[in-house]
């Protein structure tokens, strides 16, 4: 596995993306690169069981199965201890999300899509490299729509991150 040299920048960019979704408010509009965009409401989950159901629905969407070869592979979802991170375990194809009250920040759609993109990434090396980022943006486009995908492209680019 290659060194994951872009991980911290990816996490910083995604923190900014989450803040944009949070700020979009009831009208779901944000200003980005001089353009007003309407973002979809971001799903929030109450438990790892809710995340599991969501991941299965997304994985079986025709737009996902047609685009990503690895979508046919099942994904397990489990609770994890601690509240600082969600993560994906390639061996065992498992998404782990914190289920504690302090870990609720991770029970949101953008975080779950980040972890699901690790599952769908055909290379997984480096873990947050250009192929992964292209997979993530394609997944966001298919699930949340083109406006959300544009937000990802612009902000990832602002952080100097390249998509393949």
Where are these regions (language model features)?
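Walker B catalytic acidic pair
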Residues: 115
